[in-house]
């Protein structure tokens, strides 16, 4: 078995404890589009998937309003994103891995600029070797981004572990 050299961290839901906040954001904006709100975490888990476009489709978002819903969601999410907590042991765990000599990277489906802003809110940008987000707000797959990064670093996939909270994170791993 190959020794682990690199940790790829998911951001939303893994280091950032934004599950309840994300549900609140959806429930705040969906009524304006005559779309159903969520009753809670269980319903969210039943519906959520990647890419997020499919999650939106499951919730009744048509192609005609997808862009409007995505932009409204992003604006509402950013409005109070400085109130979202990290998971209780997130910083300590990152530090423990750093002390063990592991490379660490945030690999997120979030838009790159917003991702950097969020990490900065918690003083975390400098704790990672790289922060890899997407070039758009549509939260598509991060698999290719991760693969390209590992290739550019020369780190074999077998020496990498992905830590996340979604089925997509398991697919990326």
What are these regions (language model features)?
Residues 3-92:
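N-terminal helical cap/lid subdomain that shapes the substrate entry/recognition surface
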Residues 55, 96, 118, 171-172:
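Well-formed, non-transmembrane alpha-helical positions, independent of function
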Residues 47, 88-89, 110, 137, ...:
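Short beta->alpha linker loops
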Residues 31-37, 62, 100, 123-127, ...:
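Short helix-capping segments at alpha-helix termini
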Residues 78-106, 112-116, 143:
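Short, acidic loop-to-helix structural element flanking the phosphoryl-transfer center
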Residues 83, 113-161, 167-171:
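Substrate-recognition "cap/lid" segment bordering the active-site pocket of phosphatases
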């Amino acid at each position: 078995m190959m020794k682990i050299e690199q940790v790829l961290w998911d951001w939303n839901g893994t280091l950032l404890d934004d599950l309840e906040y994300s549900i609140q954001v959806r429930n705040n904006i969906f009524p304006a589009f005559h779309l159903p709100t969520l009753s809670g975490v269980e319903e969210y888990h039943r519906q959520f998937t990647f890419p997020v476009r499919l999650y939106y489709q499951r919730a009744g978002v048509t192609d005609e309003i997808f862009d409007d819903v995505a932009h409204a969601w992003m604006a509402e999410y950013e409005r109070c994103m400085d109130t979202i907590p990290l998971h209780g042991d997130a910083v300590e765990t990152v530090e423990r891995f750093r002390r063990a000599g592991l490379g660490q990277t945030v690999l997120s489906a979030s838009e790159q600029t917003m991702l950097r802003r969020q990490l900065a809110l918690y003083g975390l940008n400098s704790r990672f070797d790289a922060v890899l987000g997407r070039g758009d707000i549509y939260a598509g797959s991060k698999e290719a981004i991760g693969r390209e990064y590992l290739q550019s670093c020369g780190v074999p996939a077998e020496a990498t572990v992905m830590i996340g909270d979604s089925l997509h994170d398991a697919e990326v791993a």
